[in-house]
From Swiss-Prot:
InterPro entries: DnaT, DnaT_DNA_bind. Involved in the restart of stalled replication forks, which reloads the replicative helicase on sites other than the origin of replication. Can function in multiple replication restart pathways. Displaces ssDNA from a PriB-ssDNA complex. Probably forms a spiral filament on ssDNA. This is Replication restart protein DnaT. It comes from Shigella dysenteriae serotype 1 (strain Sd197). Disulfide bonds: none annotated. Keywords: DNA replication, DNA-binding, Primosome. The lineage of its organism: Bacteria, Pseudomonadati, Pseudomonadota, Gammaproteobacteria, Enterobacterales. The keyword DNA-binding applies. Residues 156-179 are annotated as: Disordered.
Length: 179
């Protein structure tokens, strides 16, 4: 079994038992590694060094700032179901498509393989809120379906790449080229 000794001063357990005050007085940094049967058994620490270590531990346990953040900043509010307004309405932040949106989109000729993501919905809502146009709920859903169809097809059906990722070179040599 390997072990790491955290001090340059090493002493056998017999020497420590025989005269512990002298051993600790000679210890550099106030700490001695005590060995028994050629293996580290424990550390002996002077009272002064122990007080320093406890003060350091207490200092590190305190927060680095006096500012305490409110717990409610970390909790997302639960979305309450919002009734769909009757007639035409402008887009609002809590708008949601119907539960059977994918089926309805198929009826409108838009085949969606996956449900709308929160990012796609947030982008759609933000755009149409800024426009300020008014439509019926079904018309909003049709616009969302069309937006998803165009947005997802723009990249060949693949999700958009993260611009922050580092690309990896392809190590294969195409046919007709020499390596």
């Amino acid at each position: 079994m390997s072990s790491r000794v955290l001090t340059p001063d090493v002493v056998g357990i017999d020497a420590l038992v025989h005269d512990h005050q002298t051993v600790l007085a000679k210890a550099e940094g106030g700490v001695v590694a005590v060995f028994a049967n050629n293996a580290p058994a424990f550390y002996a620490v002077t009272p002064a060094r122990l007080a320093e270590l406890l003060a350091l531990e207490e200092k590190l346990a305190r927060p680095g700032s006096d500012v305490a953040l409110d717990e409610q900043l970390y909790q997302e509010p639960q979305a309450a179901p919002v009734a769909v307004p009757m007639g035409k309405f402008a887009m609002y932040p809590d708008w949601q498509p119907d539960a059977d949106f994918i089926r309805l989109a198929a009826l409108w000729g838009v085949a969606l393989r996956e449900p709308v993501t929160t990012e796609e919905l947030a982008s759609f809502i933000a755009y149409w809120q800024a426009e300020g146009k008014v439509f019926h709920h079904v018309q909003w859903q049709q616009k969302l379906a069309r937006s998803l169809q165009i947005g997802r097809a723009s990249n060949g059906g693949l999700p958009k790449r993260d611009v922050n990722t580092v690309s990896e070179p392809d190590s294969q040599i195409p046919p007709g080229f020499r390596g």
